[in-house]
Amino acid sequence: RIEYADQISLRMLVQHRSGIPSFTDVPDFWLNPPNNSQETLSMVLDLPAQFKPGTEYYYSNTNYLLLRDLLDQILGYSHHEVVKKEILQPLSLDHTYMSLKEVNSTQIMSGFHVGYTPDLKTEGDTMFASAEDVGLFIRALNNGSVFKSEKEAAIYKEIYVYEHTGLMPGYQSI
């Protein structure tokens, strides 16, 4: 039910070259957010592709949703553990959290967006990081130290387009 699904590789998902529409671009997504990943994915099923896989670049949050769910299914445990073990711990990102349960919610900034009242901090799909940790991560990403091999680094170097600022109602990372 995803157009060209049989032609999309994991690399295309990582590089935002899959052509799969982003669920955040679906009308009313922000006004009526889904309750789980199945509901989220259903928002883009049967929609036309943005383009044929591998031919263009288009930032799609759906790609990350699919990658996350694949990791969980294949590994048999949460993608949170993978992120902690492979990224957060090696980079000593001690002020980055995978769950609201890990932090004092009164210590986290609340988002504000004119015309949109809900705060989008939710359990399970959100990460929280201090500005310092975000800076450390971006530095490691750009100098390649977050990657374990040249092959991993090449995936990032081949596609990175400075265009997405992490915008969602009430929050913007750059």
Language-model regions, residue ranges each:
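Short, surface-exposed loop or secondary-structure junction motifs
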Residues: 2-174
